[in-house]
């Protein structure tokens, strides 16, 4: 299964490269993994692989959008998504016109569970009928939203609460929205398999709830990475505004057809090598933040203490070097007033940026020499400047936070963009003595 998956992964990687050939053309002739790079200058904004293609179809571009009366300038990033899910399709057209005949979307209102159930039903099962045996203690069968709630529960998109409650007025979280969409896209089994992440000897990691869903949602681009207003970035437990939900539904319904099978194959049989307690602790600590957003200068998984190294951040999240710092660095009583609550103490890593980390090593590692816990450095635009770093966890996988993907994931780095742009590695965690 793993060998088959690896072969198909390589073939699909080639297909993906053809799809984004304009973006990747500059990298095709370069060396994949050089152990002795040139002298690196100071770092630049973190990079990452191109996002999977998705967007408006040609037919949609010919469809005149509804002139929404309540979209503000800071909502413009969501306008294509809103037009797709509420203008062309009507899946999220939940608010009637006002007295003047103006259409409203209420982009900043929290999305209710009953609205989300209806949007999912309209998008993925418009002709379905509910199982009459599904009942709710807080939603009568005569309620117009009952049908959609029952269909959502029947298909496993949304679950009932204690006492057969649906809680129709409650707001949805990112975790709930992303689970609905991952399952609607047919990736339920893949997400469940990812939840069982283990080392070769069968020792499973204590993955957080919906770990597989969070990982696949990041890879699918279901959460918008707001680079210009990072205060709007969300974690898996954030209650979502309607414009954020619109983006998730937009992405899920406009992905190229090869993306889902590509990801299903890539994560099939994912397994990490056997490792000691220290390295295992790094992985266990890192995976709890999968699904957290990319924040430039971000280095904390909770509200920023003072003084942080890169200034106060708008919310929990990490840039690439911040995630590596957070996972590996030992508290020296200097930059961190509060030590992260990790099970491992950490190791000396005084540098904060990817380029500074890349320079401060006496031995630069080639890809074949990497071991779990090693840092991997990349030159995303091939200008002689390291602009990305992640933490290798073995068997071709790395704990990564990139601006293009939009946050923290476990990424396949043995082929594709990561291998093409890899320059060298650095060992922070000493190898065990023979």
What do these predicted regions represent?
Residues 293-318, 371, 378-421:
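Glycine-rich catalytic cores of cysteine/serine-nucleophile enzymes that process amide/ester linkages
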Residues 2-35:
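Secretory targeting and sorting signals
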Residues 270-271, 419-434:
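Low-complexity, Gly/Ser/Thr/Pro-rich intrinsically disordered linker/tail segments
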Residues 264-340, 429:
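N-terminal capping segments
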Residues 272-273, 278-283, 325, 333-408:
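...with weaker cross-activation on analogous glycine-rich loops/strands in unrelated enzymes
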Residues 79-83, 87, 114, 118, ...:
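Solvent-exposed, polar/charged alpha-helical surfaces in well-ordered, non-transmembrane soluble domains
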Residues 34-79, 93-117, 121-147, 154, ...:
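Feature responds to low-complexity, polar/acidic, surface-exposed segments characteristic
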Residues 86-91, 121-129, 153-157, 182-190, ...:
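Sec-exported extracytoplasmic/periplasmic mature domains
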């Amino acid at each position: 299964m793993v060998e088959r998956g690896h072969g198909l992964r390589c073939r699909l990687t080639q297909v993906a490269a053809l799809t984004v050939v304009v973006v990747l053309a500059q990298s095709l002739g370069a060396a994949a993994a050089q152990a002795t790079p040139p002298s690196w200058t100071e770092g630049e904004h973190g990079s990452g692989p191109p996002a999977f293609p998705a967007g408006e179809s040609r037919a949609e571009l010919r469809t005149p959008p509804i002139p929404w009366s309540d979209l503000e300038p800071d909502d413009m990033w969501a306008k294509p998504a809103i037009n797709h899910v509420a203008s062309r399709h009507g899946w999220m057209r939940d608010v009637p016109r006002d007295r003047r005949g103006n259409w409203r979307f209420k982009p900043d209102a929290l999305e209710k569970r009953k609205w989300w159930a209806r949007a999912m039903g309209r998008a993925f099962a418009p002709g379905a009928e509910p199982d009459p045996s599904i009942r709710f203690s807080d939603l009568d069968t005569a309620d117009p939203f009952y049908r959609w709630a029952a269909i959502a529960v029947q298909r496993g998109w949304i679950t009932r609460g204690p006492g057969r409650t649906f809680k129709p007025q409650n707001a949805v979280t990112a975790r709930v929205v992303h689970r609905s969409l991952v399952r609607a896209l047919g990736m339920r089994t893949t997400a469940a398999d990812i939840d069982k992440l283990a080392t070769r000897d069968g020792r499973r990691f204590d993955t957080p709830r919906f770990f597989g869903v969070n990982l696949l949602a990041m890879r699918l681009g279901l959460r918008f990475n707001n680079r210009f207003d990072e205060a709007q970035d969300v974690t898996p437990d954030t209650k979502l505004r309607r414009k954020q939900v619109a983006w998730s539904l937009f992405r899920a319904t406009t992905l190229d057809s090869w993306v889902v099978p590509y990801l299903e194959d890539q994560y099939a049989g994912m397994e990490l090598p056997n490792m000691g307690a220290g390295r295992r602790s790094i992985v266990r600590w890192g995976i709890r933040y999968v699904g957290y957003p990319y924040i430039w200068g971000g280095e904390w998984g909770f509200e920023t203490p003072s003084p942080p190294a890169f200034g106060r951040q708008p919310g929990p999240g990490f840039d690439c070097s911040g995630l590596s710092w957070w996972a590996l660095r030992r508290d020296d009583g200097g930059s961190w007033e509060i030590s992260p609550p990790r099970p491992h103490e950490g190791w000396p890593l005084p540098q904060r940026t990817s380029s500074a980390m890349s320079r401060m090593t006496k031995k630069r590692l080639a890809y074949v020499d990497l071991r779990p816990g090693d840092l991997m450095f990349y030159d995303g635009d091939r200008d002689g400047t390291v602009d990305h770093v992640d933490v290798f966890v073995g068997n071709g996988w790395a704990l990564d936070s990139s601006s293009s993907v939009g946050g923290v994931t476990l990424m396949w780095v043995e082929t594709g963009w990561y291998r093409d742009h890899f320059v060298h590695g650095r060992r922070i965690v000493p190898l065990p003595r023979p």
